[in-house]
Amino acid sequence: MKILLINGSPKGKRSNSLKLAYSFIEGFKNGCTDDEESISIDELHVASMNIAACKGCFACWQKTPGICCIKDDMQTVIEKLIDADLILWSFPLYYFNVPGILKNLIDRQLPMSLPFMSSKQDGYGSGSHDSRYDMDGKKHVLISTCGFYSADGNYDSVLRMFDHFLGKGNYTTIFCGQGELFRVKELSARTDEYLSTVKCAGSEYAMTGTISEKTDTILHTLLYPRDVFEKMADASWGISKTTGEKEPDDLVFTRQMASLYNKDSYDGKERVLEIHFTDLRHTYQIQLSKTGSEVFTDGRL
């Protein structure tokens, strides 16, 4: 079993999505019936590779069939794509599609197609080109995180693109919202729980070629409720929503801490927490109420 992991994050090995991909691979190895020695894993970190944009010259179809005129790392990528049994596409969602560096890699797969027009076999789209190589039997898994509270409804263009060049229904997805939380060590109890579910998904995929409905449902569960996450996310920028001015780090920390308040625990009594940063001589108040939490900087409470 040859696994090819394509990390399309501009952050390289610091990618949040890559953490999910590694968990999936760990689970896959545990669930695979093959000896671990027979499983090879090849990683391509696109951010550190030299892959230029396609020129649209179509030399790879006419002048040098199957060979791109651009001499860079893409030829190696194509060789590995042809050789792999399972391909993991790991990437973040920044602006409703894959990052530009990964899109370059996808576009540069043009030499892998024949130039002659063909009909789509899955009824998706209005035309196609047959593959130059035998790609039947290859498995694909898309693993991605995004910065919205939920992945739902934000990957439409990603799905349509992969439907076109992989074929509709020919790949599995793990899309997770609130992706930036995977780098916050203080929230690791929750994110590690999610990574364990991704690991379970990898084991199931190795054994059955799919992810169970039960596990998929858990993967679609929000890391934190929408209101909690969006408060944390807004505070993380360190910029005032009203003035646009930069806020001190201790205030950012206080706002993020306050956002974790669970309003369902309200017992009928409002409470005020006052925090003194003695080294900075800053004082903040957090009001905990039936409707949620609010941070005050003027000592009014």
Q: For each of these PLM feature ranges, what is it?
A:
Residues 8, 46, 145-147, 176:
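Cofactor-binding loop segments of dinucleotide-utilizing enzymes, especially the Rossmann-like FAD-
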Residues 171-177:
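Beta-strand-loop-alpha "switch" segments that mediate conformational coupling across diverse proteins
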Residues 181-185:
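A short acidic, helix-capping loop that chelates divalent metal ions and anchors anionic groups
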Residues 237-301:
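Feature captures hydrophobic
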